[in-house]
């Protein structure tokens, strides 16, 4: 009986591991698609599995960076602004000179040639982000984590704090 139970536990652990990998691949694929990465779900899965893929070098590196961040995700305290900036540095490795720093210029989101959103002035970004992290820390015991993460996401998108990579974060 003990051997059968061990087999069941091993099978269950394998299923959990496969589900985690599948979830990670889908998350990476969808967050990069927001930033116009054209790699297919299958290509993202292959990159995560350390297989060779034909495609745009920058897009492949975006997947590698996101995967590396996932591998180290438990090392970050997401309620800590400094850790959040470190995560952005890793996510944007090899791409931007200002990765891990808030933007120092205006930011607009466009659909074609039409401006559909203008972010707050760059001079306001550090104080807005500090206020957001303070809000999260002050309310983590009173507000359910799912609601709190939704609030964080809403204001993060509103502030649009980075020159690039906001959708990946």
Task: Describe the function of each predicted region.
Residues 1-169:
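FIC/Doc superfamily catalytic core
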């Amino acid at each position: 009986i003990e051997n059968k139970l061990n087999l069941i536990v091993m099978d269950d652990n394998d299923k959990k591991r496969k589900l985690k990998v599948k979830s990670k691949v889908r998350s990476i694929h969808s967050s990069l698609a927001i930033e116009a990465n054209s790699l297919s779900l299958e290509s993202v899965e292959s990159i995560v599995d350390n297989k060779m893929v034909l495609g745009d070098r920058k897009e492949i590196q975006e997947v590698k960076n996101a995967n590396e961040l996932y591998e180290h995700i438990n090392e970050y305290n997401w309620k800590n602004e400094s850790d959040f900036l470190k995560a952005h540095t890793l996510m944007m490795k090899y791409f931007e000179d200002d990765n891990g720093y808030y933007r120092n210029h205006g930011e607009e989101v466009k659909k074609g040639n039409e401006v559909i959103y203008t972010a707050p002035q760059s001079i306001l970004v550090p104080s807005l982000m500090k206020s957001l992290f303070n809000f999260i820390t002050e309310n983590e015991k009173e507000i359910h984590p799912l609601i709190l993460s939704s609030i964080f996401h809403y204001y993060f998108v509103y502030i649009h704090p980075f020159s690039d990579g906001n959708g990946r974060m």
